[in-house]
Amino acid sequence: MNRISIRIFSILFILASNAALAQSNGDAVSSKKSTPASASALTIDACFSPKNYPKNAKLYGWITKTDYAEVVDGVLYAVNASTLAKTQIIKVDSFVKITKTAIKSLTGEDVNLFGIPQIKWTGDYQGWFEVGRFVMAVDFKKPVTDNLMFGPVQVKYSINGQSEEAQATEYSPDAELIAVIKKDNLYITGRKTSASKNLANSGSGEIQITKDGGNGIVYGQSVHRNEFGISKGLFWSGDNDKLAFYRMDERRVTDYPLFGIQSRPAKANSIKYPMAGDSSHTVTLGIYHLMSDRLVYLNTQGTYDHYLTNITWTPDCKFVYISWVNREQNKMELRKYDAVSGGLVSVDYQMSHPKFVEPENGPLFIPGSNTDFLLQSESDGWNHLYLFKFANKRPIIKQITKGNWEVTDVLGFTKDGKYLLFENTMASPLERHVHALDWKESKVTATGMSAKIIDLTPSNGTNKCSFNAENGLMINTLSNYQTPRKIYLIDVTNQIGNSLTQNGPTKTKLPYTETAIPAGATITIGEGVNHKIIFESPNPIASLGLGKMEINKRMVNGFDQYSRIFYPSNFDPNKKYPVVVYVYGGPHAQMITNSWLGGGNLWMHYMAENGYIVYTQDNRGSSHRGLAFENAVHRQLGTAEMADQLDGLAWLKSQKWCDSTRVGIHGWSFGGFMTTSLMTRTPGKYKVGVAGGPVIDWSYYEIMYTERYMDRPDENPEGYKANNLLGYADKLQGRLLMIHGADDDVVVWQHSLLFVDKAVKAKNAQLDYFVYPGHKHNVVGPDRVHLYKKISQYFFDFL
């Protein structure tokens, strides 16, 4: 929900076969109320202790074409990619001291710095980094010395004002300029005075571009409530001369009060919160030309409440692409605009769907071309790649990947442009692999695709990669059900070359069966000489003696669906256990993956060690299973999801180890909505529920998300009514604990308060309620331990 899920770090992700699990000695689980009685050392505090998280390497990118930077035992090293030999650069303590001293001597200011920040390398051993409002230049070719005139770290320039005033920042590609948003207005700061006459004449090294920000006008920040893949609002051109930026006018949007309780009396702090069916904000895109000091806004036309996303500059910096989406979210146009005039040049692609469209990625340009690009699209029902090759200013569109699997990320092209690297679910929806595709030769057929596809990743599981096209090397972070974290350095160039001449070793056999490899594709896989392990985390919870985990796949309502079970370490299949169902169930989330975290968490092990089975199922509506799986919930959020969860409940109750009279359910956000729905719309099915931050009435939720899945309230009154939980408050059976953060600006507090009011009027509703003052949509920080103690105790007391 708004990309926020209730995933918690640190889990033991162990897949098991469907065979019966081994028995072990231990106390029998009571057929009555369960109480926390376990031999395991796992406590709730331990569930959130960093010592129980997989360890990670401290990598700082490529310091040269052949060496990457890494901190080990308090020292920054340059590590040779071929030999893994380390060359000491500087001690972390020395780096911190030199940096703080440089700032203090120049400005008199003290800054907080406790380690080496991420450094943007611009040359061999040279780069820059941020500390507060300061941009620091680093040159490790210089000797490590306290003499600031010759030291390796110096102040490059600073943002005027205090660092906390900057609402957003974005550096130009050459790192000589920075776009800054302060008090909702746009500024440009830097010492590259040759880029702008105004900047050269400013005296302060800063120029103000906009002046009407504030009071409902917002510049340069994320818009549309972060939907459509939007994560920022500032976009530099590749030539460092032009800056595109969002302008958002929220004056039509209703003010919504959040109350700060720390003042006396409490103070109302208003936010702009556009609820479904109400007036939305207006977004436009401006372009500022530094050299000519010219500001132009794109002529996007249409109604005021459209959506603009996927902002992409062409390589020659003459044009800007935008994915335009209508408010109904059933039509998308890929529009090309002239950066000088702001006029529309062409509409190069259109897509419509009777349910919804959701473009989240802009064009990826082919190396050496200012016109031809790749675009991700779900037009065939799965997220795949399409080549747009232009002739006479019109595109010829060719699909280059196909199959019942999804492209989940694109890493870019090899240096010679021959191969495209992309992340995908080809092996399994539970996994992520990175493949190299000979994209020019790829041919799509009725049954799939025929192409050279080389699996670059070293093992089954979740592989997250970053690729450096300049040196042909890729850093691959792997986790799976056996591996907390393992980091590989992969020679992509050699891996591709070797794979074309011989087959690699076969990867580990999966404990589940997947058959999504595209017909006709040549797949080469395997860990080999081109994979070097540069870091491996020990198992942080090996000594805790935790129980096993099992993943199943069943056909549910026409689709394969995955479920996961945590068992107690002393599990006895001949005894009866209470079950806690953990649910999310909403779009843009996948609870079950082949990874160490995998959507589970240590709290689930904690509950298992205290005598409960913990079950999770990814129902229709969740992600990475194709468009039909996700949009099955359209206009009826909650209905199909409940049907799938009830099928899972029936399966649970058919297991001889399940105490069918003692099944509880818990979830947060969309999971809180699901928990409340199942406790009230199917009363008596679950004995106990804990619902956190729940949507209660979809007409009170934000426009962008709600109208995509439900349309407007006046267009779909039946759907809104059927899934409005206020109409079911009097049907509640069993015990339900509802929890909310008082400052929640995603699912506003009003949702659960309205439900409390209905429950009180129902008189017989068994509703318990708890509020976390000062917390937003998730309870974070030290209070999270308190939250999970409360959730656990509720199940101990009533399930």
Where are these regions (language model features)?
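Serine-hydrolase catalytic core recognition
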Residues: 47, 255, 317, 446, ...
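Bacterial N-terminal signal peptides that target proteins for export
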Residues: 1-9
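Short alpha-helical "patches" and their helix-cap loops
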Residues: 5, 336-339, 491
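Beta-propeller folds
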Residues: 10-12, 21-467, 472-473, 483, ...
